[in-house]
């Protein structure tokens, strides 16, 4: 099937919660509509025959910096380039909105995906945990 991608595409929180639980192995349920309305420049949805198979969120500072957040692809849809296309379309949209920098942080297992497949450059950055792990 042909994957359809849409910037600021429609989604239901329950379908995105299922995808998030599968991608990140977390049972958390969020109100994704409220989340993106309050913090996002936009997002990209990927659908295969109407089913949500991918999502990426682009949060921003309202000016020149944007961040890739929550790139997710359904397990049975992986290996088809969907994640790369999600990030590419998010990159184009952030650039079109006037952003000058697109940031991403990731677990080591995603290093090749973000650096080699998506074209990000490694940087020195810092991170401070503000809560105790669950």
Regions inferred by a protein language model and the residue ranges of each:
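Short amphipathic alpha-helix that is part of the acyltransferase structural core
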Residues: 1-31, 45, 126, 134
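A conserved beta-strand-loop-helix scaffold within acyl/acetyltransferase catalytic domains
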Residues: 31-49, 53-72
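Conserved acetyl-CoA pyrophosphate-binding loop and the N-cap/start of the following alpha-helix
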Residues: 77, 81-89
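Conserved GNAT acetyl-CoA-binding A-motif
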Residues: 94-106
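Conserved beta-strand-loop-alpha-helix junction that forms the acyl-donor binding cleft
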Residues: 103-112, 127-134
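Conserved acetyl-CoA-binding loop of GNAT-fold acetyltransferases
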Residues: 115-125
